């Protein structure tokens, strides 16, 4: 038995998230079903983290153990031939038995795309949050730094049974783009690319942080409310959770 690490890309639009569920199509279950066809037995995979319904991934990581009777290159080709077009294995590699896709993680990074034009192309609406309202970009930029460092992110997480909600955000940036390139096409427009890197994330944390920044840019939330939320542990009253379609798990760092 060898421990095999997979790096995976997927478009999460048509899935109920990463984790296998009793009802609903998931990324994990889809990959496991294809592995079952190849190895003729049940194969369970472990992911580096769960992505919610509609969230995409550029570099999700998962592992599985199997008796390998073919090269990794051939396995990757066979697996990709069985997978639907919105899931792709981009790399397979052998790793030590001690490697764990969750416990061995040092950092993760996410990207979030927002389009703030009055109109947004139908070809990318499944990958961006279309928000056609005027935003104070300088105030949003100022607010980003308030989220970096080691803090208790209780106020910015979803309902979860995770007891320790202290996380260290190493980097949180926003970049203005006048062109967004997906696949083989580039579309002109006004976009914001948020990127956040941390030692770990709570459920809905990235989407809540982006939603908070947008509310500040819209003038619906005072910038002082961020520190107040950290101190009280209570969610800002006007904060919204950004929709899932603009969110990408960028990479997992070990």
Curated annotation (Swiss-Prot):
Amino acids binding substrate: 110
Pfam families (alphabetical): PseudoU_synth_1
Assigned protein family: Belongs to the tRNA pseudouridine synthase TruA family.
Disulfide bond annotation, renumbered to this chain: none
Active site location: 52
Keywords, sorted A to Z: Isomerase, tRNA processing
Catalysed conversion reaction: uridine(38/39/40) in tRNA = pseudouridine(38/39/40) in tRNA
A Gene Ontology biological process term: tRNA pseudouridine synthesis
SUPFAM superfamilies: Pseudouridine synthase
GO terms, molecular function: pseudouridine synthase activity; RNA binding; tRNA pseudouridine(38-40) synthase activity
Binding partners and assembly: Homodimer.
Cited function: Formation of pseudouridine at positions 38, 39 and 40 in the anticodon stem and loop of transfer RNAs.
Lineage of the organism: Bacteria, Pseudomonadati, Nitrospirota, Thermodesulfovibrionia, Thermodesulfovibrionales
CDD domains attached to this UniProt entry: PseudoU_synth_EcTruA
Enzyme Commission designation: 5.4.99.12
Designated name of the protein: tRNA pseudouridine synthase A
């Amino acid at each position: 038995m060898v421990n095999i690490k997979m790096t995976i890309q997927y478009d999460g639009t048509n899935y109920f998230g990463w984790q296998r569920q009793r009802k609903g199509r998931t990324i994990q279950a889809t990959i496991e079903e294809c592995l079952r066809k190849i190895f003729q037995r049940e194969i369970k995979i472990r992911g580096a983290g769960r992505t919610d319904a509609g969230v995409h991934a550029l570099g999700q990581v998962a592992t599985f153990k199997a008796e390998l009777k073919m090269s990794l290159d051939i396995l990757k080709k066979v697996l990709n031939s069985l997978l639907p077009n919105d899931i792709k294995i981009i790399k397979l590699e052998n790793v030590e038995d001690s490697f764990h896709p969750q416990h061995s993680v040092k950092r993760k990074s996410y990207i979030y795309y927002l389009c703030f034009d009055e109109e947004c192309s139908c070809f990318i609406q499944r990958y961006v949050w279309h928000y056609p309202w005027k935003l104070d970009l300088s105030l949003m930029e100022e607010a980003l730094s308030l989220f970096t460092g080691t803090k208790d992110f209780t106020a910015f997480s979803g309902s979860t049974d995770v007891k320790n909600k202290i996380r260290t955000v190493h980097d949180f940036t926003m970049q203005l783009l006048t062109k967004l390139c997906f696949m083989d096409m580039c579309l002109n427009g006004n976009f914001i690319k948020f990127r956040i890197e941390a030692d770990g994330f709570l459920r809905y944390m990235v989407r809540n942080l982006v939603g908070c920044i947008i509310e500040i840019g819209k003038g619906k939330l005072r910038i002082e409310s961020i520190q107040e939320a950290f101190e009280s542990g209570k969610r800002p009253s006007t904060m919204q959770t950004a929709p899932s379609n603009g969110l990408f798990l960028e990479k997992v760092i070990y």
